[in-house]
Structure formats: C-alpha cells, structure tokens
Amino acid sequence: MTTDWAEIACEVPAEMVDSLADFLVELTGNGVGIDNLHLDTFSLDTLEDTPLKSVKGYLPLDDSLEEMRIRIEQFLAQTGPSFPGYVYAPPVVTVIRNEDWANNWKVHFKPVRIGQRLVIKPTWEEYLKLEGDLVIQIDPGMAFGTGAHPTTKMCLEALERICFDASGGKLPSPVLDVGTGSGVLSIAAALLGAKEIVAVDIDPEAVRVTMENLELNGVADLVAASTTSLEQLPGGFRVVVANILAEELVRLADELTARVAPGGWLILSGILTEKEAFVCAAFNSLELVENPKELEWSCLSFRKPL
C-alpha cells in the first residue's frame, strides 16, 4: 500500500521563517520547503529576498492530518503576532499523490561537491568522477537527508579535516554516527578510511534506508546500522558525530561524551547559531576545537582530553 501525502503551506513574514521551520521539522519529522529553498530533503537554491515566505511541511495523508493542521494553526496564532508584518492566514492543505511526490522531488537533487574530495550524487544522476573524488551515491527516499543541508555538509567537512590530519590520512576508527538518517555520514566515514562504523537511529525506516545506501556504496561490511539506543553502546569511539536537534544534543550530552575515547573527536550539528552557547555549556568537559557556521547553522567539533 502506497502513502499519499499532504503539503501544508503557511504564508509568514521572512523573520518568522526559522521559527516556523523548526516547529514543522519537529512536528512532522520530515523536510521543510521555504519558497524555492528546501531544507534537509532537497538541495539548497537561492531564496529570493521577499517580505513574505511560503513555508511548507509534509505529512502522510491519514487520520492525524486534521490534528496536525490544528496544531499548526495554534502555533501561528500564538507566535505570529510577535513578528512585524504578520497577518494570520490559515494553512493551505494540498494533497500530493504518492507517485507524483516520489518522482517530482528528485528534480531538486543534483550532484554536489563537499569539501575537497567528497561528492554526493543521487542514483539517477550521472557524474564524471575526477581523480581523488570520493563519490557517495544516495537514494534518500522522501524524508532523509541528501547531504546538501548546511548541518550535514559541515559534518562531512569536519570528518574530512580529521582525516587529513590523521596518521596515514585515514579517518580513525571506530566511528559512531548518531541519528544516521540516510547514512550519508557513515558512508563518508567509510570512504575516508574508517574500518569500523556504528550507525544508529531511533527510526527503523531511517535504518532501512541507511542499509540500502550502504549496499549501494559497497561499504555495508564496514557499517553496523541499527536502532540500538545510545546507552546500550560501549565507549571508546575515536570519532562520534551527531547531527540532530540542539535540544536532543543537550539531553544526550552525558551519553555522547561517554562514548568518545580519550583524545577522540565529537562533532555536533543541527544547531541554530542562537542555540550554540546552550549546547556548548552541556559539553564543557570537552575542548572546543572548531566552530564553523553556514547560514543560520552551527557545527561544533570537540576533543576529549587524554
């Protein structure tokens, strides 16, 4: 049985976009579209400087849709008046048939170079590989990252920098990927030389997509993907990467820190710059080494003392 989807579009002032987008991501667990800019599920295009934006969330077309619509209306009514230029307009719901959704979104996903050697390409696109390129093939489905979003991109760049600085030019093992999504970070870790990688996600569908992408890239023998909880995993990981929401990073701070080996790396993203200090405070036992930013997003790279 295929699932049809509902697109819920809300027209809001530009200043309200981040707040509404964060709310929709947490509410739906799926990608969010903002005019012609797509977060996480799609590639990044130029967002025109217009006073009003159409922010779009995506939900399965089922019995929960009406409840979700009401929650979005409540958020708009409660939050909107605090933003200049806000005028309430009810969300517009559009039904997207599964076969249209599954194919039409793909036009937004093109090969993208990240860092010096990593290239992410969808399975349906051709790419002429250059010498030294490490090409990650991804078929992300509809709800998991392509690698083009700034948070994923900064994590990939951090992994590549660690690789360049490491002995032998290979990423140290073992590696832990928390909230693996489509598996793109685990695949990159394997291509960068890590020989033992653990990928975990609370969503069984994310794990299924990850396992398919691991096979697609020929690294399934290097990565163990599962829904195993963080507290069930051992410590001793030389690299831990977690690209999840800031609030979750803070909630899991002790567990994440405990999984890092002495001298090891902890890479965190999914953090809005305004929440950077909030996250840093939760990891104050570690040394902050790098803090790149892109758009409104921040990435934090820590090292654990020996």
From Swiss-Prot:
Gene Ontology molecular functions: protein-lysine N-methyltransferase activity
GO BP annotations listed: methylation
Pfam families per the UniProt record, alphabetical: PrmA
Catalytic activity: L-lysyl-[protein] + 3 S-adenosyl-L-methionine = N(6),N(6),N(6)-trimethyl-L-lysyl-[protein] + 3 S-adenosyl-L-homocysteine + 3 H(+)
UniProt xrefs under InterPro entries: Ribosomal_L11_MeTrfase_PrmA, Ribosomal_PrmA_MeTrfase, SAM-dependent_MTases_sf
Classification via Gene3D superfamilies: Vaccinia Virus protein VP39
GO cellular component: a single term: cytoplasm
Cell location: Cytoplasm
Enzyme class: transferase
Top-rank lineage group of the source organism: Bacteria
SUPFAM superfamilies: S-adenosyl-L-methionine-dependent methyltransferases
Ranges in a coiled coil: none
Binding residue positions for S-adenosyl-L-methionine: T152, G179, D201, N243
Entry keywords, A to Z: Cytoplasm, Methyltransferase, S-adenosyl-L-methionine, Transferase
Family: Belongs to the methyltransferase superfamily. PrmA family.
Function, in words: Methylates ribosomal protein L11.
Protein name: Ribosomal protein L11 methyltransferase
Phylogenetic classification of the source organism: Bacteria, Pseudomonadati, Thermodesulfobacteriota, Desulfuromonadia, Geobacterales
Gene: prmA
